[in-house]
Amino acid sequence: MKTVVSVSQGSSDADYELETEFLGQPFRILRIGTDGDLSRAEAVLESVRPQADAIGLSMIHDHYQVGREQLEHPETARLEACVPDIPVTTGAGLRGILQEWAIRHTQTELGHFFDNARVLFLNGQAGYRIARSLSEHTENLQFADPYLDFGVPRLLTSLTQLETYTRLTAPVMFQPMAVKAINALHHSPLYRLGEKLVSGSLHSAVQDSHVIVGAVGDLESFTSKELDGKTVITSRVTDSVLDWMRSRKVAMVVDYSPWLAGRPIGVNVMEAMISAALSRTPEQLGPDDYLDVIQSLGIEPRILYPNGYRRVNRFAFVIHPLSQQYLTKTPPLDWISSVSPPAVMNLVEKAVAYTPPFIYSKVSGIRSPTGEEAEGWLITVGGTPREIMAHGPEFTYSRLLAAAKLAKKLGAQIMGLGAFTKVVGDAGITVAKRAPLPITTGNSYSASGALWAAHDAVKRIGRVSIGESGKMAGKAMVVGATGAIGSVCARLLAKAVEEIYLAAPEPAKLLALKESIEQETPGAIVHVAGSADRDVADMDMIVTATSGAGKRILDIMRVKPGCVITDVARPLDIPAEDVAKRPDVLVIESGEIQLPGEPRMKDIGLPAGIAYACLAETIVLTLEGRFENFTLGRNIEWEKVREIYKMGLKHGMELASISGVNGVFSEEDFERVRVLAAQSEDEADPQAVAAN
């Protein structure tokens, strides 16, 4: 029987002894903790020397390879020198392989998990292999080595900085004079005075990160305030450690340590066992030796969820002021607007269009029934629709790309475009080609939400029946039918309504759309018109989806009583004063979506927990982990409209209470439209009046 001894600088309370079989050979494993006493560790090494076939050193500084620098810690070298005739290892060779594999395994298993994640290394030199692997998926790497080494509240923010820091500090780090100077600094009154500030700065860095890499012992000072929702990459996660993670609300743990005899063991122990089993020193072990052991034992990283399955994905969404009036709601512009004439505010509106993007609000609390969560940021670009349309596409492209750069830095894995930012130029295609993360316009869910809301409203008013074909026995019109959202609404309405009318000032595109719909939906009755006015009086349902930027696109006084108008456009196609003229018509502001969970964000002009459909599409894709360019350009695929609708249902999205320009519609509002429409019919039909 071969004997492997693990001499640890950790607590002796965790000592154990076990016998097991390894690579077909019987092994005895002995763990001896020395409670941080280096002299005691030397004595233990001397005492176990006659019986040990290999020795592992645990909870002591490893020999690190960082860039081209090889760090050899003098205390580790001192212990290794105690037993020159026996293989001694810290597990560095195997640890590097398991660390890197843990990252690649997790990224493959969970898909895009580390994309743009903000990662904090409590010891970057020890986690260098992890950092190199993560750098393939994110540039948002931070290293707290200056905190731990010198108590300096400064984070390194790249692998290059870590390598430079190591190159500069390694020659003096372990010199006796340097060690004394550092200890003296840590015990000086000046350092004690700023110690809380340094500690608070590190705690803040942990709270702002998405992934934490470090030993379990390095995490002890952090609470659920910092660790809630975080992913921790560490080793030797026992049941008690998992309970500790659970109490801190950690979302996920990646444990790269190997298991043996039903328990996690130190990587140093496993490498010492390999060395003893193969009768080679750790320096003589090669890649094939490690691969044979890993595969024969079935060792793989563990992905653990302390509080049940929980995955937190991240998004960004670009918004902008929809009118000059929106600018007056933001300090200090609210004060300026109160004392300035319109001419000054016009200049302010022009100036604000040139401001760089900034974070308007953090979004949190979105939880799917499946266990996924989404958090994100609303990023504002300054241009109103008037200013956006007054400039060429490149003006807006440059601001959207700046927003995408900010989103990536924040950790977003996908970015959505809102309102007029998604109709400029080629409707997102150019931005997606240049952006450092996936882009979606949200138009697929906007189309879905518009028809969802219209269908629900028509049913609740109850004036249109279902015909023999199974479709709505009535007429529906799409105004702005050749646009991105309008064309998809037209395709879907053709499958749900017996007769549809398409209105847009682009005859050639209308004819092509009509032809396409008739091929997709045999038997569909499709009419086309250059404007809405000619046929609007006969419609039971109207969807407006123009980019008119406030221009009047239909005469509401000609609309049929009881008609449901869904206004998808932003800014709205139908102004509030027009809506007030027709109490017998229901004008709804497209289909806003009720988000799952307990969403928290600043005011976006909707009731709490409700989002515009384009924002909801970005959130649905985030919850689904579909980090791809989903909806781009003006020709939306109706298959994607259907797909995003199904994904939304899966993640708990619901049609919100239908709203109009004056807020949420009540049952009394639907009844009012129903009654007034019936009265209008009676007044228009003398025979009906006589019968009454």
Which stretches of residues belong to each language-model region?
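ADP-ribose/adenylate-binding Rossmann-like module
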Residues: 230-244, 414, 557-596
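Active-site rim beta-loop-alpha module in soluble metabolic enzymes
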Residues: 152-217
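Adenosine-phosphate binding glycine-rich loop
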Residues: 253-323, 333, 358, 364, ...
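N-terminal basic/disordered segments at the start of proteins
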Residues: 1-25, 294-370
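Rossmann-fold NAD(P) dinucleotide-binding segment
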Residues: 221-227, 537-538, 548-563
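Glycine-rich phosphate/diphosphate-binding loop of Rossmann-like nucleotide-binding domains
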Residues: 116, 125-181, 456-544
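Glycine/serine-rich phosphate-binding loop and adjoining beta1-alpha1 elements at the start
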Residues: 63-104, 366-470, 602-612, 616-617, ...
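Electropositive, gly/pro-rich neighborhoods at or near active sites that engage anionic ligands
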Residues: 7-138, 142-151, 298, 307-313, ...
